[in-house]
């Protein structure tokens, strides 16, 4: 996740479609301002209170489905292209997101269940996923992350407002249920990058008379 994330474009069709299934996640994501997280933190706090975990879990599943659906529209060449963050490829960016979404929710679950390790390592943000991964493996990574999230979210239920020791260098500290929601916000940041890449491929001049994407 980059601290210099671009502000969302609220007129994107995919955004409105996703918001129907993930209103809290997309609503919090809309609060992002370039380089600042104060607005999204406020939105996350207001939407991830007591009793929110089960609803947020369903929304995370919808976001995971949207990620996989978008990945499946991309041509093979896209996964080695710039991924919209730092110098990562698309494959590295989505591999990063798959690991991050599971890790953030697992952190909330460990804190909620009283199992936070005393020797927990310092969080290192913006770690790229593996190089050279293709469509099928990225889809599997997202699916595996969602299974981890589903198990972890069950431990957060009833503990959404509990404090979590996770101290993220870019976000700071959030409560257990807030990490569940923020994982989805982070997903949508990368989903936006994927849509921009898909649009750029779709709109580039065709060299063989065929559309590039879609």
For each feature predicted by the language model, list its residue ranges.
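Short, contiguous alpha-helical
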Residues: 2-45, 80-122, 161-214
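Weak global preference for isoleucine
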Residues: 25, 32, 38, 56, ...
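Short, contiguous, helix-prone interaction/anchoring segments in small proteins
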Residues: 40-79
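A short, mixed-charge helix-start or loop-turn motif at secondary-structure junctions
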Residues: 46-53, 128-132, 169-176
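Acidic/histidine-rich alpha-helical segments that form the ligand environment
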Residues: 59-72, 107, 123-163, 181
């Amino acid at each position: 996740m980059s601290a210099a994330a671009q502000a969302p474009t609220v007129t994107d069709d995919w955004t409105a479609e996703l918001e129907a299934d993930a209103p809290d996640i997309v609503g919090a994501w809309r609060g992002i301002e370039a380089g600042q997280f104060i607005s999204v933190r406020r939105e996350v706090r207001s939407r991830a209170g007591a009793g929110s975990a089960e609803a947020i879990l369903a929304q995370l599943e919808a976001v995971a489905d949207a990620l996989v659906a978008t990945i499946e529209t991309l041509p093979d060449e896209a996964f080695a292209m710039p991924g919209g963050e730092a110098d990562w490829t698309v494959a590295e960016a989505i591999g990063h997101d798959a690991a991050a979404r599971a890790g953030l929710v697992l952190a909330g679950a460990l804190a909620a269940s009283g199992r936070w390790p005393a020797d927990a390592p310092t969080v290192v943000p913006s770690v790229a996923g593996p190089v050279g991964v293709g469509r099928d493996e990225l889809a599997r990574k997202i699916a595996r992350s969602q299974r981890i999230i589903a198990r972890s979210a069950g431990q957060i239920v009833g503990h959404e407002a509990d404090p979590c020791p996770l101290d993220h260098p870019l976000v700071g500290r959030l409560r257990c249920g807030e990490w569940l929601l923020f994982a989805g916000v982070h997903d949508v940041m990368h989903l936006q990058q994927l849509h921009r890449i898909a649009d750029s491929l779709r709109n580039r001049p065709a060299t063989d008379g065929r559309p590039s994407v879609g």
